């Protein structure tokens, strides 16, 4: 055992219950010879969590935490991100990216409670998650020891992992292996790897979990009304709900209509491109409805400036900078812009499409029929537009005149 290993007395492991983190748990026990605490965050994975406690104990965990973080996840992580209308590279609603900071936060809280001197995760050395986890760890404790097995061990193939599992009595799932990996929470489910690495191949229909195939969705559209207060969704069809309940409800409705499927070849933080296929039914509906209420309540120039910040905000979330001062600065500006975003949006769901068909605000509407109508001239003198156009065209006319002299 290396000296660095001897210095570690207790490790808190972010444990999913899958084969990889089960192998990691046993490997930590074997290589570090210390106490290992397994921690699983309930972010809405569903049935996946049921066997985790027994599995962790059977694999060698000295203690197990399974914490229900669904409400905190949606209220303090998903909703702030949706107030920013964040979207990565035009398609990805950041379902995995936004989950990692919360998992790391609770993991570090457990480390403090338990007096652990190290934390560990199951992210590979090629992916984004190692960065997201570890940036968060160091935010909470700059001196924490991070154990990243994928960057240490020599188990560099799937067969090597299987052999290690067999040697150490770790159960290997007997169910037919699906040729892709997945990650699920209340905001989305993601798929990557395996057959999806063929960028020309269409994902098989049996891969999808949350959504019906659009062509098999109901032939009749469904209309949904979503109420917002200060930029946060608070009710669906007039029924008040908690953040997690609301998102779960929209996931079900959206899934029935095939809403929220995305197939993206994205740029990872580490520099390589990677294909991700995502199902985000509730999130897709929320973003559409939120934008609709903004249209009727938000000042034009405030919206323009906020919109210019969306790519940077999304990049920070994707790259793992949730706890950074720059993300917090942007959040302050964005949240100030959301004070007026109070109203209701009506969206139409039909065979994979989510479209706004109405929006209203009783308290913050900036739409005035007298100003906007094409039928009256009582409050807007159309002749005034002549001066407006001439002033705004000045730089273009000067440019044309100067080019004419060349």
UniProtKB/Swiss-Prot annotation:
Gene3D superfamilies: Argininosuccinate synthetase, chain A, domain 2 (3.90.1260.10), HUPs (3.40.50.620), Single helix bin (1.20.5.470). Keywords: Amino-acid biosynthesis, Arginine biosynthesis, ATP-binding, Cytoplasm, Ligase, Nucleotide-binding. It is an enzyme of class 6 (ligase). ATP binds at residues 14-22, 41, 122. Its main location: cytoplasm. One of its GO terms (molecular function) is argininosuccinate synthase activity. CDD domains: ASS (cd01999). L-citrulline binds at residues 92, 97, 128, 132, 181, 190, 266, 278. It holds the Pfam family Arginosuc_syn_C. It is found in: Cytoplasm. Belongs to the argininosuccinate synthase family. Type 1 subfamily. This is Argininosuccinate synthase. It comes from Geobacter sulfurreducens (strain ATCC 51573 / DSM 12127 / PCA). The lineage of its organism: Bacteria, Pseudomonadati, Thermodesulfobacteriota, Desulfuromonadia, Geobacterales.
């Amino acid at each position: 055992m290396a000296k660095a290993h001897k210095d570690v007395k207790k490790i808190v492991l972010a444990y999913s219950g899958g084969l990889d983190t089960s192998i990691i748990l046993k490997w930590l026990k074997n290589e570090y010879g210390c106490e290992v605490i397994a921690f699983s965050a309930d972010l809405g994975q569903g049935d996946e969590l049921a066997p985790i406690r027994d599995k962790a104990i059977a694999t060698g965990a000295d203690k197990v935490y399974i914490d229900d973080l669904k409400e905190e996840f949606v209220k303090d992580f998903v909703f702030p991100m949706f107030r920013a209308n964040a979207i990565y590279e035009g398609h990805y609603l950041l379902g995995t990216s936004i989950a990692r900071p919360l998992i790391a936060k609770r993991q570090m809280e457990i480390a403090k409670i338990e007096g652990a001197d190290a934390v560990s995760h199951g992210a590979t050395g090629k992916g984004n998650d190692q960065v997201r986890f570890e940036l968060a760890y160091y935010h909470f404790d700059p001196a924490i020891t991070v154990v990243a097995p994928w960057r240490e061990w020599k188990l560099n193939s799937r067969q090597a992992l299987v052999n290690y599992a067999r040697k150490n009595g770790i159960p290997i799932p007997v169910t037919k292996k699906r040729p892709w990996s997945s990650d699920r929470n209340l905001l989305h489910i993601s798929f990557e790897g395996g057959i999806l690495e063929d960028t020309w191949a269409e994902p098989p229909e049996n891969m999808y979990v949350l959504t019906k195939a659009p062509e098999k969705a109901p032939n009749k559209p469904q209309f949904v009304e979503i109420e917002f207060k200060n930029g946060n969704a608070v009710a669906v069809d007039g029924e008040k709900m908690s953040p997690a309940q609301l998102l779960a409800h929209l996931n079900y409705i959206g899934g029935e209509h095939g809403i929220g499927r995305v197939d993206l070849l994205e740029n990872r933080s580490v520099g390589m491109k990677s294909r991700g296929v995502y199902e985000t039914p509730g999130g897709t509906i929320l973003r559409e409805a939120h934008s609709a209420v903004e249209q009727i309540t938000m000042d034009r120039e405030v919206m323009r400036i906020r919109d210019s910040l969306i790519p940077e905000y999304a990049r920070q979330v994707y790259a793992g900078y949730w706890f950074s001062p720059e993300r917090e600065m942007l959040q302050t500006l964005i949240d100030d812009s959301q004070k007026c975003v109070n109203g209701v949006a009506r969206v139409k769901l039909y065979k994979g499409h989510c479209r706004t068909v109405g929006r209203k605000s009783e308290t913050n509407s900036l739409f005035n029929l007298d100003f906007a109508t094409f039928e009256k001239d009582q409050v807007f003198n159309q002749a005034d537009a002549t001066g407006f156009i001439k002033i705004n065209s000045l730089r273009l006319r000067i440019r044309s005149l100067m080019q004419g002299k060349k």
